[in-house]
């Protein structure tokens, strides 16, 4: 086990709801982005679209999983602005688009910690395009769910973008799918679900009713000691270390959390998401901010004898993604994240198999997802996320998501030179839309944005609610792109105001001027007469 002094703290507000986001990401690049081991700007070529797989009626597709809303921004955004947007949405990943509105990369909280802060870059002066993982892998809503999940586990990345017609429509987070799968399998094992029996008979024969229970025993019942080895890396810092030092520890050890320890005893935890949310988004200096100011003190921990299943339950119930582990003497020996535990559980099954049994191990993961996703969901589980529900109508066919559930929409307009510009922007922020349009038009002011409604009228967009209404209108017509109409006429309100004053009060002004002039003339005449008489 490798330990290094470093300081860290865990976020109390962390939640399992971290949107994942990235689309076309190469597997190795994805893994490096999420683990922080990838170099910056390695892959610049545009990836091919995902291979289309024929889907039979009985197979589960991505749109039936629990999808999350993706945060999408332009790759020309600064790291600071990106972090503020991520903090406002409480997400730890953001998808990036290029000038052609095509998905170009992904940035995660770990990238912020290890590629920006640890390298001494200034977030307010650094563009996200400089630190993003380029060309992430993506799937479509009709891709096989099992293949998408296996791809994420094997590639060791949590976030997988879901793309339709070139647009990012959602984000798949493997942690949500994992917890759902575990909940379903536990319910089936405890209640002897008849549905589980039917599923097993259909897939693997009537003699395999014990498969689910066996799978649980082999994958989740081993202790964390089977995961934590002498080579396990744990980053240790002191509470008095600056955040900058903690981020360098994360970078050097390729981890996304550090433990704050006193004599190797766990006193706190600091994760890459804490650095994003509590330091960068708050515009604090990483060099001057001490770890103790932003760490989570006294985090919930697990002993090395805790089972994998119990560890996952601890993390799920506490709504956090990192779990410090201590040995029998109370010393910190590891800090595991949910993806590490998941991957280790699968590896445990494969490593324990040999010969003919290994053939079963090779398909163990597929059977795990297949069986779990086909089981009856727990009572407190919503069959689909809001995003998934919008992708499937009552007949099981794909439909357009309702307003607010998709983070971006396609727009196009004709600029002053007659060129048609097309781009993707949020369908909720008028300020962001105006910023993109003005940048592309090289306009500073005097710009109004409108769209044409179903009656042929041009409706002004001047606030967020107007933009939401415009996007909703376009979706209701089945449109993939909303055409904008621009008015570059400079504002003339001040001139109109002056004109109004002239017309409404002009008579009074001229009358007052005439009276004053008359008074001056009379005074002059009187003074002249007085001087003339005095000479006589």
Swiss-Prot record:
| SUPFAM superfamilies reported for this sequence | CAD & PB1 domains (SSF54277), CBS-domain pair (SSF54631)
Extract the coiled-coil ranges from the record. Answer: none
Per UniProt, residues of the CBS domain are 66-124, 132-187, 228-287, 295-354
All copies of the PB1 domain together span: 406-489
Spell out the subcellular localization from the entry: Membrane
Stated name of the protein: CBS domain-containing protein CBSCBSPB2
* Membrane-spanning ranges: 509-529
Domain of life, per UniProt, equals Eukaryota
Membrane topology qualifier: Single-pass membrane protein
Return the annotated region ranges for Disordered: 1-60
User: Can the keyword Membrane be found in this entry's annotation?
Assistant: yes
Gene Ontology annotations for the cellular component aspect, listed alphabetically: membrane
Quote the InterPro entries the UniProt record gives.
CBS_dom (IPR000644), CBS_dom_sf (IPR046342), CBS_domain-containing (IPR051462), PB1-like (IPR053793), PB1_dom (IPR000270)
Q: Where is the composition biased (Low complexity)?
A: 1-23
- Alphabetical keyword list: CBS domain, Membrane, Repeat, Transmembrane, Transmembrane helix
């Amino acid at each position: 086990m490798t330990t290094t002094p470093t300081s860290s703290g865990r976020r109390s507000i962390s939640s399992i709801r971290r949107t994942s986001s990235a689309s076309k990401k190469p597997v190795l690049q994805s893994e490096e982005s999420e683990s922080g081991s990838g170099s910056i700007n390695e892959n610049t070529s545009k990836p091919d679209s995902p291979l289309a797989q024929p889907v039979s009626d009985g197979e589960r597709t991505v749109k039936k999983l629990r999808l999350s809303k993706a945060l999408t921004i332009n790759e020309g955004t600064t790291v600071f602005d990106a972090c503020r947007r991520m903090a406002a949405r409480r997400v730890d990943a953001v998808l990036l688009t290029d000038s052609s509105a095509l998905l170009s990369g992904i940035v995660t909280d770990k990238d912020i910690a290890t590629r920006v802060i640890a390298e001494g870059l200034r977030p307010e002066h650094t563009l996200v395009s400089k630190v993003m993982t380029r060309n992430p892998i993506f799937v479509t809503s009709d891709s096989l769910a099992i293949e998408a999940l296996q791809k994420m586990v094997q590639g060791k990345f949590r976030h997988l973008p879901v793309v339709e017609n070139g647009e990012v429509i959602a984000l798949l987070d493997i942690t949500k799918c994992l917890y759902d799968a575990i909940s379903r399998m536990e319910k089936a094992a405890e209640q002897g679900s008849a549905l589980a029996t039917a599923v097993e008979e259909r897939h693997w024969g009537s003699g395999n009713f014990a498969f689910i229970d066996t799978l649980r025993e082999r994958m989740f019942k081993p202790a964390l000691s089977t995961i934590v080895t002498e080579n396990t890396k744990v980053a240790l810092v002191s509470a008095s270390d600056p955040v900058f030092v903690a981020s360098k520890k994360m970078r050097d050890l390729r981890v996304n959390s550090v433990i704050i320890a006193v004599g190797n005893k766990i006193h706190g935890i600091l994760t890459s998401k804490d650095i994003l949310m509590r330091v960068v988004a708050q515009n604090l200096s990483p060099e001057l901010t001490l770890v103790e100011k932003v760490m989570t003190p006294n985090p919930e921990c697990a002993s090395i004898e805790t089972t994998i299943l119990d560890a996952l339950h601890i993390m799920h119930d506490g709504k956090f993604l990192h779990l410090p582990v201590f040995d029998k003497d109370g010393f910190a020996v590891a800090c595991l994240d949910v993806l590490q535990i998941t991957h280790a559980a699968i590896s445990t099954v494969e490593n324990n198999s040999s010969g003919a049994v290994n053939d079963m191990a090779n398909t163990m993961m597929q059977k795990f997802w297949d069986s779990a996703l086909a089981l009856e969901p727990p009572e407190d589980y919503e069959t689909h996320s809001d995003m998934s529900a919008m992708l499937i109508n009552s007949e099981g066919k794909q439909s357009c998501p309702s307003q607010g559930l998709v983070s971006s929409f396609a727009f196009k307009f004709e600029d002053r030179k007659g060129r048609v510009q097309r781009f993707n922007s949020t369908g909720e922020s008028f300020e962001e839309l105006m910023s993109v349009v003005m940048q592309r038009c090289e306009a500073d002011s005097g710009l109004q944005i409108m769209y044409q409604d179903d009656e042929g009228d041009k409706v002004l967009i001047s606030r967020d609610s107007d933009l939401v209404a415009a996007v909703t209108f376009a979706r209701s017509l089945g449109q993939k792109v909303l055409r904008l109409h621009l008015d570059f006429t400079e504002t003339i309100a001040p001139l109109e105001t002056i004109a109004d004053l002239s017309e409404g009060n002009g008579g009074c002004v001229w009358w007052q001027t005439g009276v004053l002039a008359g008074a001056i003339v009379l005074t002059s005449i009187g003074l002249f007469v007085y001087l003339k008489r005095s000479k006589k």
